[in-house]
From Swiss-Prot:
Complexes and interactors: Homohexamer. Each subunit is composed of an acidic and a basic chain derived from a single precursor and linked by a disulfide bond.
Annotated region described as IgE-binding, given as residue ranges: 118-132, 208-219, 238-249
Keyword Signal found: yes
Biased composition (Basic and acidic residues): 219-228, 282-316
Domain of life: Eukaryota
Name the record gives this protein: 11S globulin seed storage protein 1
Residue ranges occupied by any Cupin type-1 domain in the UniProt entry: 42-255, 329-478
PROSITE patterns assigned: 11S_SEED_STORAGE
Amino acid sequence: MAKPILLSIYLCLIIVALFNGCLAQSGGRQQHKFGQCQLNRLDALEPTNRIEAEAGVIESWDPNHQQLQCAGVAVVRRTIEPNGLLLPHYSNAPQLVYIARGRGITGVLFPGCPETFEESQRQSQQGQRREFQQDRHQKIRHFREGDIIAFPAGVAHWCYNDGSSPVVAIFLLDTHNNANQLDQNPRNFYLAGNPDDEFRPQGQQEYEQHRRQQQHQQRRGEHGEQQRDLGNNVFSGFDAEFLADAFNVDTETARRLQSENDHRGSIVRVEGRQLQVIRPRWSREEQEHEERKERERERESESERRQSRRGGRDDNGLEETICTLSLRENIGDPSRADIYTEEAGRISTVNSHNLPILRWLQLSAERGALYSDALYVPHWNLNAHSVVYALRGRAEVQVVDNFGQTVFDDELREGQLLTIPQNFAVVKRARDEGFEWVSFKTNENAMVSPLAGRTSAIRALPEEVLVNAFQIPREDARRLKFNRQESTLVRSRSRSSRSERRAEV
C-alpha cells in the first residue's frame, strides 16, 4: 500500500520540478501592464534628445513613448569621433549594440575575472631591470562595422574609436528584462566623467543638475569644505576621505575620481596619440585572417553544440566560462547571410545558437538588405517584439494589427526607428536606392512566420481549406500556394505598374 503512495508523491514532485523549470526558461522578461500594447497607430520615430560631448554625440529616443513602452526597451545612438573614448559605465538592463559604421576596441569588465592582458617587463638603458608596477587589464576586444555586441546588465564596459572615421553604434536596452530589478527607466551608471542623462530632456536635466548641485554644496558647506561643481558618476556622491581610504591614495587624487568641474561629457577625446592599451597588434591582412579563423571556430563550436544537444549532454546555457565569453558576432558581412536571393537581397540573424550569451540576455537580432524594388514578404514575429532601425535607404512599410487594421503605412528612412509588436503582420518594400536595417528582437530565438512564399502559412494549408476560407476556385487556391517559389525575399513588380493600377482604381 505504501509503494503506490510513494510512487504518486514521486511523480507529483517530478511534475512540479518540470513545471518550475519551464517557468524558469520562459521567465526572461517582465509582464506588461494591461493595455500597454493596445496601439492603434505606429510612427517612424526620430531621436528626441541630443547631447554633444567633447568627442562625440549622443542621441536617444524617448523611452516613455508608447511604442517603446510596449516593447519594453530604450534606444540610444552614439557617434564616437576618431580618438574618442566612451567612458566606462554599466546599465540596469542588458544591451545589444549594433555597429553601424566604423571600428574600434572595447573592454568588458567581468567581476572576478583575471587580468589576462599584461605589460612585458622593460629594461633600463644599462640593461638592468627597474622596479615598477606592470600594467595589467582584462581582455580587449576589437569591433567593426556589422558587429552585434552583447553587454549583460550591471557589467561595466568602455569603447574607443581607433580608426580614422566616426563610429556610429545603436544601443538597445531591454528594460523589461528580469535582470533589471529597478523600475522601467533606463539608467546608465558611469565610473568616470560628468555625463548628462542620455534619456532625459535637456530642461529636466538642467533642473535636476541644479537641485543636486545645491544639495551637494549645502552638505560641503556643513563640513566647511570648498564648494565645487558636482560630478555625475558613481564616485561623485561619496566623501573623498572614504575614497582615499578605499584606494589607499591621497585625498586630492580621490577627488579626481569625482570628476568635479569636468564638462567633457560621456565621450572624451584621448589626449596626444592614440589610446595606449595592451593588445595584440595586427596588420589588416592579419586581422582579416584572424576574423576568418574566428568564423571557422564559431562554426565548429556551433556544430559541437548541436552534437551535444543530440547526445543529451546538459550544458550551462553559456558554453563558456564567464571570463572568456564570446560577446560579438558580425552579421553585416554578406558572406554570413542566412537567407539570400540573388535579385532581392539577404538576411542575417544572430541568436543564442550562434552567440550563446544571448540565452542569458534573452535577446536576438536580424540584419537585412533589400535591393531596389525588392520585397520582404508579409510575415509576423511569433515570439518577440521587433525594434527596427533603418541603416540606409528607404522602404515602404505596412503593419497590420489583430483587427486587420493598418496601424502603419508610411516610409521608413535612414536613422528612423519603428517598433513592430509581437504577432503584428508587416511587409517591407525597398525604394529605388534599396533599404538596409537592423532589427532587435526581445527573444533569444525570435521566430518569423511568412504569409507568402515557399515556407509560408498559406503554402502549408490544404487547397480545400483555402477554397472554403477565401471562397475562391481551386485553381486560384493552387496559384496562391505555388506561384511564389522564393521563401522570404522576392523581386517586386515594377512601381510603375502599381501606380497605373492605383490610378485605374
